[in-house]
Amino acid sequence: MLTWLTRDSLTFPPLEKALHDPNGLLAAGGDLSPERLVQAYRHGCFPWYQDGQPILWWSPDPRTVLLPDQLHVSRSLAKLMRQGRYQVSFDTDFPAVIAACAAPRDYADGTWITDTMRNAYCELHRRGIAHSVEVRQDGKLVGGLYGLAMGQLFFGESMFSRADNASKVGFVTLVNHLRDAGFALIDCQMPTNHLHSLGAHAISRAEFADYLAHHLDQPNSATWVA
């Protein structure tokens, strides 16, 4: 039975209460306040819904993740990065990155990044919790991604690319940055061929919960220079 959240409580149901069909649907309702979003990620769930639907909270099993020391960079991608065709930065234009991620895609109907969601994550960015990666070519934004950094975990949300492999270059740069800063895991949420090609793999919900328990409150040395 699906749990409906109320606006006056930030409590989520136990992860094992998530539905099997659809896989991982944990709760509905509530809001996208910064406090609730932080609590959601700490609990192991994230919001994902279409405009016009109630807010839906998910904790899929299995969960797609990437361990920084298991990053796979193909020869062709490594060569592209050495060429210096793209310039990568952090936190220089979070609003532009999330707007680009929210833009319609040829292969999808609509977008799950609603205006309300964009505003919510921009507020998390202002609070130093959400971060962006910008990939530029000749000064033009051609790729990027955003997510949340908590303790030694990074929760990836969405990425976009307007030039060949631009999002991959941004993702690889981010993973190397996180590895050097002591991060233990990047949460990729759902499987894609794009992420699997970079070394992402599936773990059980229980194993993901163990990472939360052991790494959420541990320090990291990441710097995000705007």
UniProtKB/Swiss-Prot annotation:
The main enzyme category here is: transferase
Q: Which Gene3D superfamilies match?
A: Leucyl/phenylalanyl-tRNA-protein transferase, C-terminal domain, Leucyl/phenylalanyl-tRNA-protein transferase, N-terminal domain
Listed under catalytic activity are:
N-terminal L-lysyl-[protein] + L-leucyl-tRNA(Leu) = N-terminal L-leucyl-L-lysyl-[protein] + tRNA(Leu) + H(+); N-terminal L-arginyl-[protein] + L-leucyl-tRNA(Leu) = N-terminal L-leucyl-L-arginyl-[protein] + tRNA(Leu) + H(+); L-phenylalanyl-tRNA(Phe) + an N-terminal L-alpha-aminoacyl-[protein] = an N-terminal L-phenylalanyl-L-alpha-aminoacyl-[protein] + tRNA(Phe)
GO MF annotations in UniProt:
leucyl-tRNA--protein transferase activity
Q: What is its main location?
A: cytoplasm
**TM ranges:** none
Q: Which controlled-vocabulary keywords does the entry list?
A: Acyltransferase, Cytoplasm, Transferase
Q: List the disulfide bonds.
A: none
Gene Ontology terms describing biological process: protein catabolic process
Name of one Pfam family that matches: Leu_Phe_trans
- GO CC field: cytoplasm
Q: Which SUPFAM superfamilies match?
A: Acyl-CoA N-acyltransferases (Nat)
InterPro entries membership: Acyl_CoA_acyltransferase, Leu/Phe-tRNA_Trfase, Leu/Phe-tRNA_Trfase_C, Leu/Phe-tRNA_Trfase_N
Return the HAMAP family for the record. Leu_Phe_trans
Q: Tell me its family.
A: Belongs to the L/F-transferase family.
Protein name, entry field: Leucyl/phenylalanyl-tRNA--protein transferase
Q: What lineage is this protein's organism placed in?
A: Bacteria, Pseudomonadati, Pseudomonadota, Gammaproteobacteria, Pseudomonadales
